């Protein structure tokens, strides 16, 4: 088991989302890998939690990453947040799969989404959609 591709996978997903024109039209440059301070206004995309398990086989060391990408907004209703969630999904499913600096992304699957109303740190209501993905990576530099 290896976590060797953890940083490379996050960097590739971040680059794909940050460079996607359709997503940029909806959120500008608001794609983050850390929660912005306070409760930022508007809508943003956040790379979030990740769980990893061994997925090595006879041909390569590998891992299965289960990761969450969130859409957070202070806008009324879920419609705008859902449009952003669709753009995230479209960006990640567009071929080719994102290239990794180390190893290879074998597959990336959407698993589920959960939309919720929450209270921000200032007490204001925010909406959040958590998109869950499963990624299979292999470390082709290690046999």
Question: Which positions does each model-derived feature cover?
Answer:
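Mid-chain, well-packed structural core segment of small domains
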Residues: 74-97
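Conserved acidic
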Residues: 5, 9, 80, 125
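Oligomerization/assembly interface segments of phage tail-like spikes and tubes
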Residues: 61-75, 127-138
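Small/polar-rich, solvent-exposed N-terminal microdomains that initiate assembly or binding
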Residues: 1-57, 95, 99-102, 106, ...
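Acidic-leaning, charged glycine-interspersed low-complexity segments
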Residues: 90-141
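Short glycine/proline-enriched loop/turn "hinge" motifs that connect secondary-structure elements
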Residues: 57-62, 122-123
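A structural signal for the main folded, soluble domain(s) of proteins
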Residues: 29, 56, 79, 127-130
């Amino acid at each position: 088991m290896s976590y060797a591709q953890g940083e490379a996978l996050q960097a590739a997903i971040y680059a794909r989302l940050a460079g996607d024109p359709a997503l940029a039209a909806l959120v500008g440059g608001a794609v983050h890998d850390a929660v912005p301070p306070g409760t930022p206004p508007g809508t943003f995309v956040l790379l979030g939690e990740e769980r990893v398990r061994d997925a090595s086989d006879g041909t390569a060391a590998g891992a299965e990453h289960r990761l969450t990408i969130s859409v957070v907004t202070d806008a009324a209703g879920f419609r705008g947040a859902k449009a952003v969630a669709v753009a995230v999904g479209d960006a990640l499913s567009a071929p080719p799969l994102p290239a990794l600096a180390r190893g290879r992304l074998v597959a990336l699957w959407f698993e589920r989404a959960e939309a919720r109303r929450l209270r921000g740190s200032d007490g204001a209501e925010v909406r959040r959609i958590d998109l869950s993905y499963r990624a299979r990576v292999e470390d082709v530099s290690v046999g």
